[in-house]
């Protein structure tokens, strides 16, 4: 079993960048997205996702990233029905106002973009979840993706179980 990558700097060791203190591209701390420029890791052209390159990725507090636009929906849907490019390690109704935080780290030397949802609480219910997604540059804007689940205590944040996958 893989363990979450730490030692990335910042207040908790999972990255210098903190969701709750960042400028939101859409939504709020409960159902919001921030835009992260990924060119320091993937080069000036950006990251290639199924033939389209993006210089920025939207990190959503509800456990997913999107490429073409931010998402503010709190209810997860079947990933194949989402309709926009996305990768979801754990798309559910996360509410960091109730606990936890989201960190991210861009490491050009290692060629990684690491996003950590640390001790995040559900909108309704109890418990916390910790999980991580790492995008690794494999050259020419291409990448590999790794999901790491540390401690999952809940699967249903409000309506519907968590969704995992990509589209």
State the predicted function of each range.
Residues 1-167:
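Extracytoplasmic Ser/Thr/Pro-rich, glycosylation-prone low-complexity segments
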């Amino acid at each position: 079993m893989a363990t979450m990558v730490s030692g990335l700097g910042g207040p908790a060791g999972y990255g210098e960048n903190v969701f709750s203190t960042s400028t939101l591209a859409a939504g709020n701390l409960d159902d919001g997205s921030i835009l992260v420029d990924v060119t320091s890791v993937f080069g000036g052209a950006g990251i290639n996702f199924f033939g389209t390159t993006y210089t920025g990725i939207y990190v959503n507090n509800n456990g997913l990233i999107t490429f073409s636009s931010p998402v503010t929906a709190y209810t997860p849907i079947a990933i194949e029905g989402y309709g926009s490019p996305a990768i979801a390690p754990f798309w559910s109704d996360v509410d960091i106002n109730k606990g936890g935080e989201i960190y991210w780290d861009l490491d050009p030397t290692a060629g990684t973009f690491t996003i950590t949802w640390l001790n995040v609480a559900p909108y309704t219910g109890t418990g916390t979840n910790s999980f991580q997604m790492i995008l690794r540059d494999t050259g020419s804007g291409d990448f590999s993706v790794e999901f790491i689940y540390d401690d999952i205590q809940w699967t249903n944040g409000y309506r519907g179980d968590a969704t995992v996958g990509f589209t």
